[in-house]
Amino acid sequence: MSGNTGERPFADIITSIRYWVIHSITIPSLFIAGWLFVSTGLAYDVFGTPRPNEYFTENRQEVPLITDRFNSLEQIESYTKSI
């Protein structure tokens, strides 16, 4: 025998007008905020990733791969100096 937890059934929640009034505003605004976050380039600044035109510089046209496991710090420093 199961008890009642006092919560509203999910079907009642998604069929209520109040739910759709709130979510018809919040869902599109979250989508627009995410689109603006990415399209303005703020995502690159926040997460520190290079922009698509910054992957290869004029001085360095090869892919910066770490090949020597024991001297990896020196390789990383040489790659970051050329940026």
From Swiss-Prot:
Where along the chain is heme bound?
A: H23
Topology relative to the membrane:
Single-pass membrane protein
What GO molecular functions are on record for this protein? electron transfer activity; heme binding; iron ion binding
Task: Name the predominant localization.
Answer: plastid
Q: Could you tell me which cysteines form disulfide bridges?
A: none
Subcellular location, record wording:
Plastid, Chloroplast thylakoid membrane
Which Gene3D superfamilies does this entry report, sorted A to Z? Photosystem II cytochrome b559, alpha subunit
Taxonomically, the superkingdom here is Eukaryota
Transmembrane feature ranges: 21-35
**GO cellular component term, pick one:** photosystem II reaction center
One biological process term from GO is: photosynthetic electron transport chain
Q: How is the cofactor bound?
A: With its partner (PsbF) binds heme. PSII binds additional chlorophylls, carotenoids and specific lipids.
Q: Which InterPro entries match?
A: PSII_cyt_b559_asu, PSII_cyt_b559_asu_sf, PSII_cyt_b559_CS, PSII_cyt_b559_N, PSII_cytb559_asu_lum
Q: Which residues form a coiled coil?
A: none
One Pfam family matching this protein: Cytochrom_B559a
Enumerate the UniProt keywords alphabetically: Chloroplast, Electron transport, Heme, Iron, Membrane, Metal-binding, Photosynthesis, Photosystem II, Plastid, Thylakoid, Transmembrane, Transmembrane helix, Transport
Q: Which cofactor does it need?
A: heme b
* Similarity field: Belongs to the PsbE/PsbF family.
User: Per its database record, what is this protein's job?
Assistant: This b-type cytochrome is tightly associated with the reaction center of photosystem II (PSII). PSII is a light-driven water:plastoquinone oxidoreductase that uses light energy to abstract electrons from H(2)O, generating O(2) and a proton gradient subsequently used for ATP formation. It consists of a core antenna complex that captures photons, and an electron transfer chain that converts photonic excitation into a charge separation.
Q: Which PANTHER family match?
A: CYTOCHROME B559 SUBUNIT BETA-RELATED
Subunit: Heterodimer of an alpha subunit and a beta subunit. PSII is composed of 1 copy each of membrane proteins PsbA, PsbB, PsbC, PsbD, PsbE, PsbF, PsbH, PsbI, PsbJ, PsbK, PsbL, PsbM, PsbT, PsbX, PsbY, PsbZ, Psb30/Ycf12, at least 3 peripheral proteins of the oxygen-evolving complex and a large number of cofactors. It forms dimeric complexes.
Q: What is this protein called?
A: Cytochrome b559 subunit alpha
